[in-house]
Amino acid sequence: MSNLSPEPHKNRQMAEWFGLDAARYDRARPGYPEALVDRIIALSPGKNFVDVGCGTGISSRPFQAAGCMVLGVEVDGRMAEFARGRGLDVEVARFEDWEPAGRTFDAVVSGTAWHWVDPLAGARKVAGVLSPSGLLALFDNAFELPPAVMAAHGAAYRHAMPDATFQEPPRKPAEDDAEEYAKQIYAKQYVKAAEGIRQTGAFSEPEELRFEWDRTYTRDEWLDAVPTQGGLNHLDEDARARFLAHLGAAIDELGGSFTINYATEGITAIRR
């Protein structure tokens, strides 16, 4: 599920909305599975990390907890300030313009943020700061809402904005096509990133990461999370309130909670 344009790095003002409520973003956005963190640490030659687009530190803290030294690079000063308050060292800059000042690192990671980075310029920057055999790891949480919850979103949107058009996203294919569906999602998310990595000539062939996990949301947890996903940015305050109230009532009718099947997907590449 995504609200991103094909080349979001060319329209970065879209990302500025997220810093308006950094505390909500940090509280409500999903984290990442422990298996992902373990895999990335195992692939890295050491524990000196940079987290590109660290935001409030959601992607950084699991690596810190595992004993890594993590430096965040974040373009939004509001998000950076929140992350600092949670114990993360953060430098404020666009990653492409960030000045590493001669420092090198064992791994560069980016969780749900690389789409805001120019894929070629970003990969070149990474190549310049990684130590020999250093790791680049890009990852994101992909998910599809249960059909009843997706329908509730559509109904709530039509209730809040009766004159607007709500387009339902394409449905997940039948179970026997699940593997092909996963490949399509992977390709959509990371084909441009992989192209940028290859064009530098500085990395091994990118390899896929994929970890599946579930999370159950209560009504209140989901209503807290929805505004952090960007899909309501264009609604005024009254329309947003109508949307959330209608959606909350629908979730109550569905039993008050539901489970999302997440797939944390991404790519890794090794510095030659």
Predicted regions and their residues:
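Conserved Class I S-adenosyl-L-methionine
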Residues: 183-272
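A short acidic, Gly/Pro-enriched loop at the edge of an enzyme's catalytic core
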Residues: 98-108
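Conserved catalytic/acceptor-binding region of the Class I
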Residues: 131-212
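A short glycine-rich, Lys/Arg-flanked "PGG" loop and its adjoining helix->strand segment in the class I
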Residues: 121-132
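Conserved class I S-adenosyl-L-methionine
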Residues: 1-44, 47-53
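Class I SAM-dependent methyltransferase SAM/SAH-binding core
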Residues: 56-98
